[in-house]
Amino acid sequence: MPITQNTRLVHVDSPLGEDVLLLQGMEGSEELGRLFHYELDLTSEDRAIRFDQLLGKPMSLGLELPSGGKRYFHGIACSCRQLTGHGQFAGYRVSLRPWFWLLTRTSDCRIFQNKTVPDIIKQVFRDLGFSDFEDSLSASYREWEYCVQYRETSFDFVSRLMEQEGIYYYFRHEKDRHVLVLADAYGAHGTAPDYASVPFYPPDQQMRERDHFYDWQLAREVQSGSLALNDYDFLRPRASLEVRSSVPRNHSNGDHPLYDYPGEYLQSSDGEHYARTRIEAIHSQFERVQLRGRARGLGAGHLFKLTGYDRADQNREYLVVVARYQIRQEAYESGQADLAEPFLSELDCMDASQAFRPLPLTPMPIVRGPQTAVVVGPDGEEIWTDQYGRVKVHFHWDRHDQSNENSSCWIRVSQAWAGKNWGAIQLPRIGQEVIVSFLEGDPDRPIITGRVYNAEQAVPYKLPANATQSGMKSRSSKEGSSANFNEIRMEDKKGAEQLFIHAEKNQDIEVENDETHWVGHDRSKTIDNDETVRVKHDRSERVDNHESISIGVNRTEEVGNNEKITIGVNRTERVGSNETITIGANRTEKVGANEDITIASHRTEDVGGNESIAIGGNRDE
């Protein structure tokens, strides 16, 4: 006669069909903010079950309740093992875990921008094809400008974000699914049907007509009394962002402080939230009550009130934080031992009036050294920056972005010199490769510390032929070609040293006091168009040897007052055509020796008044 589970305390529902797998026993655990795990010991008359029919597929257990209803344990079959059988039966062991556990099997590098943590969590779930979750959050959460999943599983990424924000979860089990419930407060919890209160019966009490607890333990542990956090905002460099939160306790040594930096916030209100949730997470461990008994309907996330205990202060409402189960069913074949207790549960509970928060156990990924990235921006732009000289980049590991102005947050750029409205600035341009470091190794906090050349963005001078050359060479924007640039270049080749300066258009030099030029040999200066020189005070010019001035067309020289010319030896002046001299007043001309005047043609002399000529000797004309 085929075996059946119709009359059993626990019914197995598997992809293999009715009564193919039967439960011998189960050990399981659940915890707020952690994954559940149910280990099923199963038996079957089929000794050759193909694991592919089970692995990765949903299974459930239906546990009969005293009221006639059922409680379900639903999960994904994540591992299967065949055991040595007994008689006509084969043994199997199957582990059930939540769908959330499957996120431990996938990892990514991904950037989220301008989203709250609940929005990020839901997007991760949906992108991976999961929809069995429920938002029971009551708090509001800040928008993260920039949040990175970096070389970590999607489970770790979501878990650490929840732990940071003080969000946790538990699972609601149904026959055909289990639902992840996001929680952050008392209002996210409720009582199980028929288990709003559960009595305590001492072990020696004989009449136990309903589900109950028979063992009670209370534990307390010294915790830190306060937590202070701090951070820095470059937009408010002098602002104090330190925050503090405390949970006072009456016992000795209950006030030891914790301090941490950075707190990963820019607004004090966000810091206060983080400080409060972290100290609440610590004090979630302060007091625990452990109850053992037979409360088949209670699991992690349920509320209930304990009744009947001899300490009145302990008859209060509790929140189940951890639940451990042990189920044993009677043997399907004679000769196998039966256990007296078909169901036992052990619950770790806390006072429901106290806030529960998950401890931050999931490690933050660390970027272990600098990376390179490519500067990006909108189509049609060559330089894309904001008022602080920040730029955006595409990381080589990011397979989701479009390499545009939305690829990253604005990232600060290290410069050679940075003062208050003074210093050096060279903005990385779109397409250039930059070196990116991360503050404290945090992928959420990038900073550009350098730039490098690559095969597309090559060096400005041909190497290694010009290895002795160094300098700076820019590129005109927009749409500048290799012929459009400003440049300062130094040639250090022995015997051919040179400092070369090229201005693509204008060059303006301002000297607020003295300027001195020294040229050890020749100087050549060519101006392709006009030159204007203005000296607002005196000008002295000295030529120790010859001076030659050649003027191709006209020359006009104007002296506002006196002009004095002293010639140490001879002077020769030649006018190729006419010369006109106009003297507004008197003229005195003195020749210390002879004067010869030769007029090849006519001469006209007109004296408007008297003329006096005194000749000491002869005169020949």
Please annotate each region the language model reported:
Residues 181-185, 259, 367-621:
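Structural signature for extended repeat/solenoid scaffolds and their inter-repeat hinge/linker regions
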Residues 1-110, 164, 286:
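Assembly/oligomerization scaffold segments
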Residues 69, 85-86, 115-134, 139, ...:
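Extended, domain-scale alpha-helical bundle/helix-rich regions
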Residues 27-39, 268-285, 400-415:
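Short, basic/aromatic beta-hairpin or loop at an interaction surface
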Residues 53-54, 298, 314, 428:
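Short, well-ordered loop/turn sites that connect or cap secondary structure elements
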